[in-house]
Amino acid sequence: MVVQLISKPSKFSQSRFLDDIRNLSAAINAPYSERTTIEALSVYSHSFHNGVVLWRVTDRPGDALNYRFYSREPIDTVSIAASAGLLSPDIANTLGKLVTSWSSLYDGTPEESCDFDAEKGLVKAWVYFGGMRPLDDILGAEGVPESVRQHEKRFKELGLQKVRHVAVDYHKQTVNLYFRAQGPISFQQATAFNALAGAEPPSQSQFIEMREFLNAVGYTFAVTINIDSGDIERVGYYALKLPERSAKKWPAINAQLERFVQFAPSYDREEMNAVAWSFGERKTYVKFERSYCGELIPLIKGWGTTLSS
């Protein structure tokens, strides 16, 4: 594991990041475009230098290497992207308007952030609502399509009534809702949650790990909804901030993720590693996230996020 301990809060350096992403993408055999990456860093320079930056990958060889900034202040990521040509007018006027609508809730205090693909550039926008918010507010925002709203009753029946984040994927045309699910997780709960996406229940080994690492008070649970069809394509369970690996065995990860763990640098004073189990009708995989710089742990603690350690 790459761990670098420093006394001062970690700061973003573009030259260092370019070296790191170039080396990491090569190490895990992920597609990479230097031109696209430099463009993204230039367009959102303020957010990279003043926010928090982290890595994200999956356990599937050949999948994208993603990086993300979390903003510490309200910004209009949609207008920035549209002005720079990172979003087509069509996307900016449809999915972009949805992001802007959610950001306008609660007197415009929600904070937008962005995900980037190391090859394709900007792929997703996030909105943090400043805490746990009622599902009614989120689904009732202007412009939320009926394909998303139609699931409200089912979510509430499963106890999914509080949302902290949403995300809009510009490339996949999907919306993610991030709930606080009641813990401790039970097999019955996991079976019902997986059924949202037409997925089988977790295997015994998967459930044992999920029960061990998901916070027993409550944990982050996400659904991914296709905007056109309204289908729930995937659900995900997030174990945020795994314990030190030297102190406690982590959930099982494959060789692809082991290489990521080996080569992905983190400059935060306290490293954050997270694993997420993703289930869908046709796709089941594991996601892994790691802090890069900007001090992620204090940020997510400030959100009231329940952690695994």
UniProtKB/Swiss-Prot annotation:
GO molecular function ontology, one term from the record: prenyltransferase activity
Keyword check for Flavoprotein: no
UniProt KW keywords: Prenyltransferase, Transferase
Top-level taxon in the UniProt lineage: Eukaryota
Enzyme class: transferase
Keyword check for Protein biosynthesis: no
InterPro entries: Aro_prenylTrfase, Prenyltransferase_CloQ, PrenylTrfase-like_sf
EC number in record: 2.5.1.-
Pfam families: PTase_Orf2
Other facts: The gene is not located within a recognizable secondary metabolic gene cluster.
Protein family membership: Belongs to the aromatic prenyltransferase family.
Cited function: Prenyltransferase that attaches isoprenoid moieties to carbon atoms of aromatic substrates in an enzyme-catalyzed Friedel-Crafts reaction. Shows specificity for dimethylallyl diphosphate (DMAPP) and does not accept geranyl diphosphate (GPP) or isopentenyl diphosphate (IPP). Prenylates the artificial substrate 2,7-dihydroxynaphthalene (2,7-DHN), as well as dihydrophenazine-1-carboxylic acid and 4-hydroxybenzoic acid at lower levels.
Record protein name field: Aromatic prenyltransferase
Organism: Sclerotinia sclerotiorum (strain ATCC 18683 / 1980 / Ss-1) (White mold)
